[in-house]
A protein has these predicted regions:
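Conserved core architecture of multi-subunit DNA-directed RNA polymerases
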Residues: 1-551
Length: 551
């Protein structure tokens, strides 16, 4: 998030690139660490200090006058001073300032763990199933192997096997020289003993060679390993283990290694390698660190974006995000306490797993593994997570950013108009009058049928005949844009010449329906009016339906 100097033109940019925020980025955004799960003190009705609505971190609830008599106490001054030591007096900062939660143990980010394809899986060359077993403390993962020790043990095992073979050969050779010896029985016994020895050697060799980085070991498998084998490897569990593996990745070296491997690969193997390479090269270009896919510092969004509102009768209605943040803080504080007390490993592991599940539910409650977080109010409904606020028709992008209300626009149901030309659309008279109202007012004044804007507006309200004549005049040669959501490609928005019609539905030529993916079973379309001469020229020359016949 780049700091802008006053007077910077925020519209002056060439492109937007999304990247993964690392620990340092989040701490730069933040104005303080949230330590308590409390929100508002129910006696004083003021935000709790270091809580989810803390005024010191997020700014004052009400605008402050620094010269006011009330603004004297140390507490009041503290809550109004930001981290640069400047006094904050406007409550609007509570829509901008972020906080953070320092996690007691790293957790894997669910978007990168369970996405399709799994980013962490592609980085480490592992399946999502195996990653989940590690992240949720069901299995160990090998973090490092002492190869020199392993090779020495393998050489010792081989030497022992060779010595045992020689001993068997000598023993059976001596037994075969005795007069009463049953040569056939001895040969069978010798062969059986040698086969057992070779099988035992092969088993030990396979077991040693299988101890490599990123190998998954269940609890029983690890416990059943001989002690000297356990000393060869470093194992881990949970988000901490995944973070350590990601820390060790050198993108340049890994890209070079995979490129060489892909040159000699074929078929499905090559396809998998190319998929990994594509993601790794993208991360390298964007300067993304692999360990950013694990969360150690969790950002907390501004309180005015997750409000708490008092209802009549003293009760409070709160955003679901506050409940989800509260779960994370409670579990994080409990884990810190257990670590300070040096609690048994099994208890700490369980608390780390619960912390992982709480962060999963906060980020994406649909994909959370440990059961979806539900409301504690008795309604048993699923809590809305950060992902739910962003995705879908009601999400931040489609509802608030792409779906903003626009002046000089309208919306109506579409019906077939086969008598129209392909570059024409039927526009209801009342809708056209509202869209072209300023132009109609200008035309009425130009014709001297009205002396000012007020008298022209009065004529329009009364529906005088001169108004419709003026409307006919102003729409000549004009183009309007028709858009059908979702706008998936360029043909979702096309320009048409309006033809005034009775009724309330927009008429559309059947032959242009394909581009809009529209049909006449109740679909709705939006109309937009390009205002400037340049916009009209662009609509006429580039966006007109008769100029978009070939895709």
């Amino acid at each position: 998030m780049r700091k802008l100097t006053p007077g910077t033109n925020i519209a002056d940019f060439d492109a937007v690139r999304l990247s993964i925020a690392n620990e340092d980025d989040i701490q730069k955004w933040s104005h303080g660490e949230i330590l308590k799960p409390e929100t508002i003190n129910y006696r004083t009705q003021k935000p709790e200090r270091d809580g989810l609505f803390c005024e010191k971190i997020f700014g004052p609830v009400k605008d402050i006058n620094p010269h006011d008599v009330k603004f004297k106490g140390m507490r009041s001054r503290e809550m109004a001073v930001d981290k640069n030591g400047e006094v904050v007096t406007k409550s609007i900062v509570r829509r901008e300032r972020m906080g953070h939660i320092k996690l007691a143990a790293p957790v894997a980010h669910i978007w990168f763990l369970r996405g399709t394809p799994s980013a962490v899986g592609l980085l480490l060359g592992m399946t999502v199933k195996n990653l989940e077993r590690v992240v949720y403390f069901a299995s160990y993962i090998v973090l490092a192997v002492e190869t020199a020790k392993r090779d020495k043990i393998l050489a010792d095992v081989e030497a022992e096997t060779d010595a045992a073979k020689q001993a068997i050969e000598i023993r059976y050779e001596a037994a075969g020289k005795e007069e009463s010896a049953d040569i056939k029985a001895l040969a069978e016994a010798r062969t059986k003993e040698l086969e057992e020895l070779v099988a035992n050697y092969q088993e030990k060799k396979d077991q040693l060679q299988s101890l490599e980085r990123c190998r998954i070991l269940s609890e029983n498998d690890y416990r059943n390993l001989p002690e000297d084998y356990q000393d060869l490897i470093t194992v881990g569990m949970g988000g901490q283990a995944i973070k350590q593996l990601l820390d060790d990745i050198n993108l340049d070296a890994l890209i070079k290694e995979l490129t060489e491997e892909a040159e000699g690969a074929k078929g499905q193997r090559k396809k998998k390698l190319m998929k990994r390479l594509k993601m790794l090269e993208g991360m390298q270009r964007a300067g993304i660190r692999p360990n950013s896919m694990c969360v150690t510092v969790l950002p907390v969004i501004p309180p005015d974006l997750r409000p708490m509102v008092q209802l009549t009768g003293g009760r409070f209605a709160t955003s679901d995000l506050n409940d989800l943040y509260r779960r994370v803080i409670n579990r994080n504080n409990r884990l810190k306490k257990l670590m300070d007390l040096n609690a048994p490993e099994v208890i700490r592991r369980n608390e780390q797993r619960m912390l992982q599940e709480a962060v999963d539910a906060l980020i994406d409650n649909n994909s959370a593994r440990g059961g979806r977080a539900i409301s504690a109010t008795g309604q048993r409904r699923r809590l809305k997570s950060l992902s739910d606020m962003l995705k879908g028709k009601q999400g931040r992008f489609r509802q608030n950013l792409l779906g903003k209300r626009v002046d000089y626009s309208g919306r109506s149901v579409i019906v077939s108009g086969p008598e129209l030309k392909i570059n024409q659309c039927g526009l209801p008279k009342m809708m056209a009058l509202e869209l072209f109202k300023p132009f109609v007012i200008g035309e009425l004044i130009a014709r001297e049928q009205a002396h000012n804007i007020r008298s022209a507006s009065r004529l329009i309200e009364m529906g005088e005949t001169v108004v419709w004549d003026a409307l006919d005049e102003v729409i000549k040669g004009k183009y309007v844009l028709l858009n059908r959501a979702p706008s998936l490609h360029r043909l979702s928005i096309q320009a048409f010449q309006p033809v005034l019609i009775e009724g309330r539905a927009i008429q559309l030529h059947p032959l242009v329906c394909k581009g809009f993916n529209a049909d006449f079973d109740g679909d709705q379309m939006a109309v937009h009016l390009p205002l400037s001469d340049k916009a009209q020229a662009e609509a006429r020359d580039i966006m007109a339906a008769n100029r978009n016949l070939l895709k």
